[in-house]
Amino acid sequence: MCPFCFYFCMQIILKTVMEDKKSLAGAWVEAARPRTLPASVSPVLLGCALAYYDGMFDITPAVLCLLVALFAQIASNFANDYFDFKKGADREDRLGPERAVAQGWITPKAMLAGTFVMLGLACLSGLLLICFADWRLIWVGLAIAICVLAYSAGPFPLAYNGLGDVCVLLFYGVIPVCFTYYIQTLSFSLLSFLLSVALSLIHISE
């Protein structure tokens, strides 16, 4: 599925479920921020396209890479919702998209639990990828898991200390493109790196 098709499908789901914004299912869908998910899907698809071009595409690890990206993105969105509320950055009268915890749709405790559920699913999907590549992928997974939380949490949240663009460069470009390609081909390529940087720059400029 191309990123544009994915985006429009998520828009339809969002509009359908969120007709009643007070419904619990609708609140969780809104908290997942479907509009942001194509940013996670597109680098994985690019890595898969490069593997396919080289005749090495493998559907099973490709799907697992996609699940890692989606679960990690949703976990990051949930964490951002929770920690921004705790810091007072998100209030009920904030400008921009409404946030589930600030609006009272989801309790802080439930949002934190949801964060770790999504992060756990991302880690599980990542562990399964070791069967197709190398145990050292654990270090990549650990870096992803740490940054999911560190982006918004801790004494030095990356998003609020000038490192947001660096995170986008790494986690919406270089890492998902290059490692999706690597897991299927067991090699790195200069082309995958250059295209990953180009894609991340597009995300940064949005």
Model-identified regions with their sequence ranges:
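Cytosolic, membrane-interface loops and tails of multi-pass inner-membrane proteins
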Residues: 16-25, 82-106, 205
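Cysteine-centered motifs
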Residues: 2-5, 9
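Hydrophobic alpha-helical membrane-embedded segments
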Residues: 68-81
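Residue-level detector of conserved catalytic or cofactor/ligand-binding positions
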Residues: 200-206
